[in-house]
Amino acid sequence: MNLYPKTFISLILIFTFVHASNEVLVGETTHVRDGDTFEIENTPIRLAALDCPENNTPEGRYATKIAKQFVGSQASCELTGVKSYERFVGYCSINGEDYGEILISQSACKVWRKYDVWKRYTEL
């Protein structure tokens, strides 16, 4: 029995599924949990490729304070197809600006290159 064709077809299907999951979620930012997690109309989103300090540190409280400025703003997130702790992971913009770049430029978060799967922040 020749397994090559079955393996090849399986790999194509997996590749297609992984890259076809670019769902976009658009809506109002209704809640901020911390620097890298917020909600669009009660749907939790984890920002892809960012590492923000936790809320139990002064740096984490600063990141959350910056993020809370955008509650009520229009958000658009390209979801990666991955979930982390029941949160959708995505690259997001707020009012048309890259949300990750905003947080990085304010020194609220850092790029987590290991998880920058779409290489959005390789130049930062």
Task: Report each predicted region and the residues it spans.
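Sec-dependent N-terminal signal peptides
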Residues: 6-16
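Small beta-barrel nucleic-acid-binding modules, primarily SNase/OB-fold domains
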Residues: 2, 15-124
